[in-house]
């Protein structure tokens, strides 16, 4: 589940590299837990953590370079309520989080994997949404924003029988992340927002 650790990562207390380090996070006593899937350069994660210092924020990312970069920014902002996890998101939710433990999940501009042969790599399949439902507290939300209309429509088709109520809309830029700025530079200024609210618990 955990990616191969590197010495520089192991020495950084912000970064979770193994199960022993994960166990040091007492999820039952952590209070409100928010999880960002694929935090990239970490802009949104750091803003949320700064706005809500009483909450625990866990960022999941597969790219070690991003994790190292963001961990330095966490330190420079003196934020002690962020932990970074180098992992595949699907494995992290399956293996590390118990049922009814997460208050909010967000994923801004996940990879849409547009080629048909790569569709199985997409996050938020019906199976994954059922797992996500199980890990979220009743009434809590998952926010997904994408630049791909095709990916948005695909996700909406995955939603039946996942226990979520859904709101979907087209929104202007508002997150000021690296990917959002990238699209703005290319004159792409509308994005697709899916807000999922847990309305029924799903056993997995």
UniProtKB/Swiss-Prot annotation:
Functional pathway: tRNA modification; N(7)-methylguanine-tRNA biosynthesis
Reactions it catalyzes: guanosine(46) in tRNA + S-adenosyl-L-methionine = N(7)-methylguanosine(46) in tRNA + S-adenosyl-L-homocysteine
Positions with a binding annotation for S-adenosyl-L-methionine: 36, 61, 111
EC numbers for this chain: 2.1.1.33
Active site: 111
Pfam families, A to Z: Methyltransf_4
Class of this enzyme: transferase
A molecular-function term among this protein's GO annotations: tRNA (guanine(46)-N7)-methyltransferase activity
Keywords from the UniProt entry: Methyltransferase, S-adenosyl-L-methionine, Transferase, tRNA processing
UniProt-annotated binding residues for substrate: 115, 147, 177-180
GO annotations of cellular component type: tRNA methyltransferase complex
Family classification: Belongs to the class I-like SAM-binding methyltransferase superfamily. TrmB family.
Purpose: Catalyzes the formation of N(7)-methylguanine at position 46 (m7G46) in tRNA.
The protein's name: tRNA (guanine-N(7)-)-methyltransferase
The species this protein was found in: Chlorobium phaeobacteroides (strain DSM 266 / SMG 266 / 2430)
């Amino acid at each position: 589940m955990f990616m191969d650790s590197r010495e520089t990562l192991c020495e950084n207390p912000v970064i979770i590299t193994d199960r022993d380090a994960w166990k040091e996070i007492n999820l039952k006593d952590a209070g409100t837990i928010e999880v960002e899937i694929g935090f990239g350069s970490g802009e949104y994660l750091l803003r949320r953590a700064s706005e809500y210092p009483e909450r625990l924020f866990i960022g999941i990312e597969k790219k070690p370079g991003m994790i190292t970069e963001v961990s330095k920014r966490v330190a420079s902002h003196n934020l002690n309520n962020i932990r970074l996890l180098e992992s595949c998101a699907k494995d992290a939710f399956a293996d590390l989080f118990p049922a009814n433990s997460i208050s909010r999940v967000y994923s801004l501009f996940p990879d849409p994997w547009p080629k048909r042969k790569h569709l199985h790599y997409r996050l938020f399949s019906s199976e994954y949404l059922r797992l996500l439902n199980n890990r979220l507290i009743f009434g809590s939300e998952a926010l997904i924003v994408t630049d791909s209309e095709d990916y948005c429509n695909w996700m909406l088709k995955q939603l039946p029988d996942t226990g979520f109520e859904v709101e979907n809309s087209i929104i202007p830029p508002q997150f000021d992340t690296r990917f959002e700025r990238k699209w703005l530079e290319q004159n792409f200024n509308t994005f697709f927002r899916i807000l999922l609210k847990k309305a029924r618990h799903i056993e997995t």
